Regions:
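N-terminal Rossmann-like dinucleotide-binding module
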Residues: 11-79
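Predominantly a Rossmann-like dinucleotide-binding segment in NAD(P)-dependent oxidoreductases
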Residues: 43, 152, 159-243
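Conserved SAM-binding strand-loop segment of SAM-dependent methyltransferases
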Residues: 83-89
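Contiguous beta-strand/loop segments that form the cofactor/metal-binding neighborhood of enzyme cores
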Residues: 217-294, 321-335, 352-353
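C-terminal active-site/capping subdomain that shapes the small-molecule cofactor and substrate pocket
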Residues: 289-357
Length: 357
């Protein structure tokens, strides 16, 4: 897992305007990576696309949507020519478009694999939202397709580019917390009826696939280890009709090779909760809220030092900007992005294990 920590540090440097290798810097100074945004849902329209407005190295050059009117409206806002508006029926046409370097997949989970694989086959790099896919097999197929096509694949774990998260990893790497003994984390909210996330055919699962994955991924990176034991439980409490196809609550525990343990929960039936807490042999650290789009706050009590209380000063769309720019830098410098397809696949396999109980 050491490579991922180096990538966190590199991402932090990129956010500060540094960290580009010489060859990449020359290319980035003269061009931007052209993204084709696939799917005009909430995360695309409210977060990723606005981030490109302040990005140094990324821009929206094409749009794929099943709603022509919405696509035309967004195209006008982002300077996308009419010839670069696609439907899902003519998606393969992106292959011959030199304006498109990469795709950003902001679709429901069950559509990630198909449109990522087709993009790779069209010669485009892929930045795909988490979770990587709806199943382990689909995720593996995505990774295989991108490797076969020699295209970059990055999974959009935006929190890897969030300042409080990067600061937490830095404190751990510097030994400020000592040995990690235990972690607890939770992320959940009360979901509205009718959300596509409540449909198994679209989501692949419930809150674990949607927001619990943040807790899982954070624990792996906070420890720098892969769990050797994992146990999960799921339940439905609210019998109001929302949870006919997916679970309402999931809790799971993990044990790591060092002996560190983790306890995590995720829900679609409770008020908003979002945090992770790390208990170390020398200090305690908590980030709360941890996984929201902005407003993260890190607190730490380190023996012999003044308490740390750091609210995030870089607000949304900052993490999306750094994420888009990091992927562009990796494409231009021919470096492996972090987190890549292999990283997304690990989380998919662990979530499958949690569901198995």
């Amino acid at each position: 897992m050491n490579w991922t920590r180096r990538q966190f540090n590199r991402a932090a440097a990129l956010g500060a305007g540094a960290g580009l290798v010489t060859g990449a810097r020359a290319q980035l100074s003269t061009r931007k990576l052209g993204y084709c945004v696939v799917g005009l849902g909430r995360i695309s329209m409210q977060h990723f696309m606005p981030a490109t407005k302040t990005s140094q190295y990324a821009r929206v050059t094409a749009i794929v949507s099943g709603h022509r009117d919405k696509a035309e409206r967004m195209a006008a806002e982002y300077g996308v020519p009419a010839k670069n508006i696609y439907s899902y029926d003519n998606y393969n046409g992106i292959a011959g478009n030199p304006d498109i370097d990469a795709v950003y997949i902001g679709l429901p989970n069950s559509m990630h694999a198909e449109y990522s694989i087709r993009a790779a086959q069209a010669g485009k790099h892929v930045l795909c939202e988490k979770p990587m896919a709806a199943t382990v097999d689909e995720a593996q197929a995505m990774d295989d397709a991108c490797r076969k096509a020699n295209r970059k694949l990055m999974i959009a774990y935006r929190c890897h580019f969030e300042p409080a998260h990067m600061r937490a990893f830095q404190l751990i790497r510097d030994g400020k917390l000592g040995k990690i003994e235990a972690i607890d984390s939770a992320f959940g909210f009360n979901i509205a009826p009718g959300e596509w996330r409540l449909k198994r055919a679209l989501a692949g699962g419930g809150p674990l696939m949607d927001v619990g994955i943040y807790c899982l991924n954070a624990c792996r990176h906070l420890t720098g280890e892969e769990p050797v034991e994992i146990k999960g439980y799921s339940s439905v409490v609210d019998r109001d009709g929302r949870f006919q196809e997916v679970e309402e609550n999931v809790s799971w525990s993990m044990k790591f090779p060092s002996g560190a343990v983790a306890s995590c929960s995720t829900t679609y039936g409770a008020s908003m909760t979002s945090y992770f807490r790390v208990l170390g042999s020398k200090a305690e650290l908590i980030v709360e809220p941890a996984f929201a789009y902005d407003g993260q706050r890190l607190k730490a009590k380190i023996a012999g030092e003044a308490p740390i209380d750091e609210p995030s000063t870089l607000r949304d769309p900052g993490c999306f900007v750094r994420q888009a720019d990091h992927f562009a830098e990796c494409v231009f410098s021919n470096r492996e992005p972090g987190p890549n397809g292999a990283e997304g696949l690990k989380d998919m396999k662990l979530m499958a294990a949690i569901y198995r109980g």
